[in-house]
Structures are given as structure tokens and as C-alpha cells.
A protein has these predicted regions:
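Single conserved hydrophobic/aromatic residue that forms the stacking wall/gate
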Residues: 1-11
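Juxtamembrane helix-capping/reentrant segments at transmembrane boundaries
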Residues: 8, 44-67, 130-137
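Interfacial segments of alpha-helical transmembrane regions
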Residues: 18-25, 93-105
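Transmembrane alpha-helical segments that form the membrane-embedded catalytic/substrate-channel core
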Residues: 25-43, 73-78, 101-122, 172-192
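Membrane-proximal soluble regions of multi-pass membrane proteins
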Residues: 34-43, 127-134, 191-216
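Core segments of transmembrane alpha-helices
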Residues: 67-81, 144-156
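Solvent-exposed interhelical
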Residues: 126-149
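C-terminal transmembrane module of eukaryotic multi-pass membrane proteins
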Residues: 164-195, 200-207, 211
Length: 216
């Protein structure tokens, strides 16, 4: 009886680990693939660093360290905090965990599909300087960001499925949502407004994040 009970516990533990880790591994693999595909060599410099050069040196170094590197890193680590509760010894596999794992996985699918659609659009030389406003991008200006936000809410959902997490950890995914809504999305919108003449009209008609029908 003891052996059977121990085997059952091991199976439940392995099931829990798989439900939590598979969407995270998928998410990490997507990021790694994106980096490999988009890497242009050591001489390439991200536009954010180029923009920083237009400010004074002290301000540039401050924004580089805190704004581009430290703060987002802290947010990511903070948003991973709910996993502590799902990996505790008292956590069990629940139907809600299955749903949360599926939600997390599908969020990564959403951003992966959005990335591929944008990549295919940019491959066509005829689209240079034009705005992508087809497929998922017809309904959201940043469907890839929507998927990323969904991923972090999925981490939160998996954490609370344990029944052990405090209520305040809702702040974890909300902090990531705020980062995208008030920083990442506006930054990309402003850059697109500067570089694409048709982006203003697209921006006025298209939802920032949620997949919604375009405005008339």
C-alpha cells in the first residue's frame, strides 16, 4: 500500500511539473528562436540604444541601466513569483491547473503566430515602409504583446491553482500589463508613427492590445 501511494504521489508530482513547465519551455524556445532569426551580428544596435545617444551621457546611462535592463528584469522575476506556490510540496493537480496550463500555452501560440505573420509580411520588399494590418494585426496593433501578457497571467493562474497563494500576487501580472500598456506599446507606436505614413490611420482604427474589430 505504501509503495502504491508513493508511486501515485510521484505521478501527481510529475504531472504538475509537466503542466507548469511545458508552456514555460515553449515560451523560452520561442524567445530563443526569435533571437536566432533576428540576430544581425555584433555590429547591429537596437534602436533604443541609438535613441539614447541623442540624450546627454548621464541620462543615457541612467535610462540604459534602469529603464532597459534592470527594471524589466525585476518585473520578470516578480511575475515568476506565483510559481513558488505551485511548486510547494502541498500543491496538487487540479482541473483549474489544467485550464491555466492550456491558457498559458495558447498565449504563447498567439504571440508565435503573430510573430510569424509579421515576419512573413516583412520578407516582401513591396511592404517596406508599410504597416502590417492583416490577419491578427487587423484586430490588434500588438497581438504579440497580447500573447506575452496572457503568458504572464497564465503564470499567475497556475500559481493560484494551488490554493496556497495570497491575494496580493495579482500584482505580478498586473505589473507586466502596466509595463506593456504604458511603456512598450506607446514606444513602438511612436516609432511606427515616425517611420510609416499610414500608421496614424491604422492606430486610430485598431485596438492597442485586445483582438477587436477595426473601427469604421
Amino acid at each position: 500500500r505504501y509503495s502504491s501511494s508513493a508511486a501515485s504521489d510521484v505521478y501527481k508530482r510529475q504531472t504538475l511539473d509537466l503542466l507548469v513547465l511545458l508552456p514555460i519551455i515553449f515560451w523560452a524556445a520561442r524567445l530563443t528562436r526569435n533571437w536566432i532569426i533576428s540576430w544581425r551580428g555584433f555590429e547591429h544596435e537596437d534602436f533604443r540604444y541609438i535613441d539614447l545617444k541623442n540624450t546627454n551621457r548621464l541620462n543615457a546611462e541612467f535610462r540604459n541601466f534602469f529603464g532597459i535592463h534592470l527594471f524589466p528584469t525585476l518585473i520578470v522575476n516578480f511575475c515568476l513569483y506565483p510559481l513558488i506556490f505551485i511548486f510547494s510540496n502541498n500543491a496538487t493537480v487540479t482541473p483549474f491547473l489544467y485550464l491555466a496550463s492550456l491558457f498559458t500555452f495558447m498565449s504563447v501560440v498567439l504571440e508565435t503566430v503573430a510573430d510569424e505573420q509579421m515576419r512573413d509580411f516583412r520578407k516582401d520588399p513591396m511592404n517596406k515602409g508599410k504597416t502590417m494590418k492583416y490577419k491578427l494585426w487587423k484586430y490588434s496593433r500588438h497581438p504579440n504583446y497580447l500573447g506575452e501578457i496572457g503568458f504572464w497571467f497564465g503564470i499567475y493562474f497556475m500559481g493560484i491553482s494551488s490554493g496556497l497563494a495570497p491575494m496580493w500576487i495579482i500584482l505580478c501580472p498586473l505589473s507586466m500589463l502596466a509595463l506593456f500598456v504604458f511603456a512598450s506599446c506607446p514606444m513602438m507606436d511612436n516609432r511606427s508613427l515616425e517611420n510609416r505614413s499610414d500608421y496614424k490611420e491604422y492606430m486610430e482604427k485598431t485596438s492597442q492590445l485586445l483582438l477587436l474589430p477595426p473601427k469604421n
